[in-house]
């Protein structure tokens, strides 16, 4: 019986951590590329800009630096304005010819109006004459007392029989 080696402790960058294959650059935990004793030993996928001096400071991940001065060309379909499909016009019935209208009289410019002449000031409105008291209404005939409805069984809760 052959002796088996005891399993080695699993550490960052060990191929045993991953399911199969050699760990690619994207599979390393985040602290792997940091120099030994680097304060940033964080596990997780590598972030562009973690150890990239060109990425700038203050959380600039460096992703926007790819081609800041180059313009991304759009496909030609995106530039063309969309064409609205036109429905073919349905020919209308031919118009019935009308007899020609009699010519209108040419419009004559109106004579300029004089400024408005103020009306004669009226006396302030006279107070109304007091109303004559109305004649008292004829008294209505007394109402008949309302008759109670036909007697029914007292209502019970729904479904109760």
Swiss-Prot record:
Region of interest: Disordered: 1-161
Sequence repeats: 85-90, 91-96, 97-102, 103-108, 109-114, 115-120, 121-126, 127-132, 133-138, 139-144, 145-150, 151-156
Compositional bias annotation for Basic and acidic residues: 90-161
Keyword flag Nuclease: no
Cellular location(s): Host nucleus, Host nucleolus; Host cytoplasm
Domain of life of the native organism: Viruses
Post-translational modifications: May be phosphorylated on Ser residues by host kinases.
Spans annotated as 12 X 6 AA approximate tandem repeats: 85-156
Gene Ontology terms: cellular component: host cell cytoplasm; host cell nucleolus
Task performed by this protein: Plays a role in the inhibition of host immune response. Participates in the inhibition of host autophagy by interacting with and inhibiting host PKR/EIF2AK2. This interaction also prevents the interferon-induced shut down of protein synthesis following viral infection. Downmodulates the host RLR signaling pathway via direct interaction with host RIGI and IFIH1. May also participate in nuclear egress of viral particles through interactions with host NCL and regulation of the viral UL34 mRNA.
Family indicated by similarity: Belongs to the simplex virus US11 protein family.
Written domain comment of the UniProt record: The N-terminal tetrapeptide may be responsible for virion incorporation. The C-terminal half, rich in Arg and Pro residues, seems to be responsible for the RNA-binding activity, and for the association with ribosomes and the localization to the nucleolus. This region may adopt a poly-L-proline II helix secondary structure.
Name by which UniProt lists this protein: RNA-binding protein
Organism: Human herpesvirus 1 (strain MP)
